[in-house]
Amino acid sequence: TLWQGSLFFLPQHQNKRRQKNNMNFWNTFAALFSNFGALTWQMVVMWGIGALLIYLAIVKKMEPSLLLPMGFGAILVNLPASGAITQGDTVGPISALFEAGMSNELFPLLLFIGIGAMIDFGPLLEKPWLMLFGAAAQFGIFFTLFLAGFFFDMKDAASIAVIGAADGPTAIFVANTLKSQYLGAIMVAAYSYMALVPIVQPPVIRLLTTQKERRIRMPYEKGNVTQLTKILFPVVVTVVAGLVAPASVALVGFLMFGNLLRECGVLNSLSETAQNVLANLITLLLGLTVAGQMTADKFVRPDTLLIMALGLVAFIFDTAGGVLFAKLLNLFLPEGKKLNPMIGAAGISAFPMSGRVVNKMGLAEDNQNFLLMYSISVNVSGQIASVLAGGLILSLMA
């Protein structure tokens, strides 16, 4: 009968449904853990690097506003099939940030506005001859450009060489403009060496100077710089830089615009916003964005170690260039006018760390040897010189 037939088929139908449900469950369960099969040892290495950056940011307080997002981002983008970066036709948010703020160099330039608003060029304008040390301390960039040319193509070599400026935004801008495939490694190297200034610079300085030279006192006589001079300075520097190295106009212009906000006297609230809110926000976005380029396939390779080594060479030779230039000048100066060669080491762009390191070393040799005003002035000149050097590199590579 019809009723008996339905009884016969009902258990079989339920059994098939149960089998189908079981199959769906196991398929779903397998899908949840399928990414484990896609995990590689290189990704695990990147997790370790990300964890190290987070540790340095939190425990050692080394550039926390940058290294913390960079470290977390490095973990984020090295998860199998990570949704944070573009996968196939699906655009990831970090990839979108890169396109919006890095592919057009917008983030580094906005950061330069904040940096410019932080810098007081007054001490440098009191003694403009100190700008020579900023120029001399860029020697390592061009030495490393020559050296890196043996291992990389010239555009990558130029991007790596700019690490020596100890200026993260300039390094990012140059590497991104030249479309270097090593952007992530270059940024990690640049900011790592900036943070390691108190460790890297003192041994180089001691190696190149005698105790007598390190004890040379340089009494500071405060000059008079008018407000008009401070306002005209960023405008004049931008025009001169544009005429000498047109490729540097964006870098120099945004840096000097930030300084003009500081000095004009009518935009104090905007100046404070640029120094605090803008600079911190852009630094945060930079860290996350560049982390998107720190995928295992791009980062875990022998080239990365070579880039770190070349960056260290550039940094050391920049420091040496400034010190040796001061020693050269001393050959032509009378006994009472000798310069303390250590101030030349502050000509790199790591502001204000390098200036403080030099002052601390001076006080360690002689507790009455105050070099801070000179070293900070040279450090400020290094900010301008590193940006000009980056622009010159871009002009040479054009």
Model feature map: region roles:
Residues 22-38, 44, 203-232, 266-272, ...:
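Intrinsically disordered, low-complexity non-transmembrane regions of multi-pass membrane transporters
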Residues 23-92:
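N-terminal alpha-helical transmembrane segments of multi-pass membrane transport
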Residues 99, 103-104, 113-118, 132-139, ...:
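Alpha-helical membrane segments and immediately flanking helix-loop junctions
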Residues 124-144, 296-323, 375-379:
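Entry/N-cap segments of selected transmembrane alpha helices
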Residues 181-199, 310-317, 343:
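Alpha-helical transmembrane segments
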Residues 192-266:
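Membrane-embedded hairpin module used as a gating/binding unit in multi-pass transport
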